[in-house]
Amino acid sequence: MVGRAGAVRPCGPLSPAYAARAPMEQRPVCHSGRMHSPDPLLMTAAGRDDGGTGPGAGRRARLAASRLYVCTDLQRFLRPDGTLDTAAFADFCAAAFRGGVDVIQVRDKAVDVAVELAAFAVLVPLAREHGALSAANDRADVAALAGVDVFHTGQTDLTTAQCRALLGPDVVLGRSCHTGAQVRTARAEDGLDYFCTGPVWATPTKPGRAAVGLELPTLAARLDAEDPAGARPWFAIGGVDADRLPEVRAAGAERIVVVRAVTQAEDPEAAARTLRAGLPD
């Protein structure tokens, strides 16, 4: 069931034996009215750093159960003086979470740090209220100050080891992958929790970045099938929307990252709900 303010709760009755042996992060949960059953990725994630009981385990379990990840900039939430309209930003985030979004990442290199921190002061507690995750991009200092759940980097940013040195063991770490070699490296890299494959289609949010098509999602899915023990969560990203979602799903993707499909929607909650309906439970 979904508790007050959208918080994730266990779904259905649990046998005493199952309840005794399964940490909360490993039990079936409902998010926005949809059930997530535990899978090997979630079970593996739940015990990585702290025996399946601490904040890192809970975050990784939530990431493994995630299907819909939204990246947003802050431009449309800025007032004329450059400060953040926190109420408008909060309304957007809450609508997205109600629609079934699992992760919201703030990604805007054009704003001051003070604006980013103001956004995270809204996002971090709101994500927690909804049983979802907050994410930062590129700047580990901002991520540390904001106390986000997830930190995402590109291929030329901080290494995983550097991120861990700055952020500690409990923050979920992700990376963007644009080639088959990068996908293979991400699957094997110690300390990296998830990766993204793309951009599948060209997108104005990443100008100059050539589209890679469905080749990388197909590769990631094939590698998971061949080596389930080496699997970790991955998301298809780049130009994904409701119309293209069936193609991404056919390539083997079970998780997606979207930008405009939700951020530019007239009704972000409805847009998120439509996307979530096309993804697995």
Segment roles from a protein language model:
Residues 3-23:
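Compositionally biased, low-complexity flexible segments
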Residues 30-150, 166-192, 219, 230-234, ...:
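Conserved N-terminal beta1-alpha1 strand-loop-helix module at the mouth
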Residues 155-162, 196-208, 245-275:
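Glycine-rich phosphate-binding active-site loops on the catalytic face of alpha/beta enzymes
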Residues 196, 234-240, 257:
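Glycine-rich anion-binding loop/nest that anchors nucleotide
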